[in-house]
Curated annotation (Swiss-Prot):
PANTHER family: NADH DEHYDROGENASE, NADH DEHYDROGENASE [UBIQUINONE] IRON-SULFUR PROTEIN 7, MITOCHONDRIAL. NDH-1 shuttles electrons from NADH, via FMN and iron-sulfur (Fe-S) centers, to quinones in the respiratory chain. Couples the redox reaction to proton translocation (for every two electrons transferred, four hydrogen ions are translocated across the cytoplasmic membrane), and thus conserves the redox energy in a proton gradient. Gene3D superfamilies: 3.40.50.12280. This is NADH-quinone oxidoreductase subunit B. It comes from Bordetella petrii (strain ATCC BAA-461 / DSM 12804 / CCUG 43448).
Length: 158
């Protein structure tokens, strides 16, 4: 009963939320889902010049080890089920960053019969990074915005 009273006041949950969100923002592990030319800029962001490791962002090869997916490039209808399957294999909580105008809304290939007009039709997207292709700086900015969004999210008391 004493714990319920403290939880109603919000002190313990607020402190635990802040700690958990701080830990999550300092250790984001993205799963790369490079589909087109935006993937080259994503690799550029992970290289020595921009060094995403300094933000605690380390690329992982497996969806079971990742909590963030970066969808970079044109998503075709045949690739959409694979994207959803990889997303479903990621542990909770999971987030998605849509990188480039093709992933955001189909881009140059918007009216093609074989292109999904935005990956948000397949998976829920948290941050959109515009550009064709977006620069590595834009991706870093988008990832920093993702960290801010995670920091402000309630984990325990929803």
């Amino acid at each position: 009963m004493a714990i319920d009273g403290i939880l109603k006041q919000g002190f313990i949950t607020t402190s635990a939320d802040k700690f958990l969100n701080w830990a999550k923002t300092g250790s984001m592990w993205p799963m790369t889902f490079g589909l087109a030319c935006c993937a080259v800029e994503m690799m550029h962001a992970g290289a020595a010049r921009y060094d995403l490791d300094q933000f605690g962002i380390i690329f992982r090869p497996s969806p079971r080890q990742s909590d963030l997916m970066i969808v970079a490039g044109t998503l075709c209808n045949k690739m959409a089920p694979a994207l959803r399957k990889v997303y479903d294999q990621m542990p909770e909580p999971r987030w998605v960053v849509s990188m480039g105008s093709c992933a955001n809304g189909g881009g140059y290939y918007h009216y093609s019969y074989s292109v999904v007009r935005g990956c948000d039709r397949i998976v829920p997207v948290d941050v959109y990074v515009p550009g064709c292709p977006p620069t590595a700086e834009a991706l870093v900015y988008g990832l920093l915005q993702m960290q801010n969004k995670i920091r402000l999210t309630n984990t325990i008391a929803r």
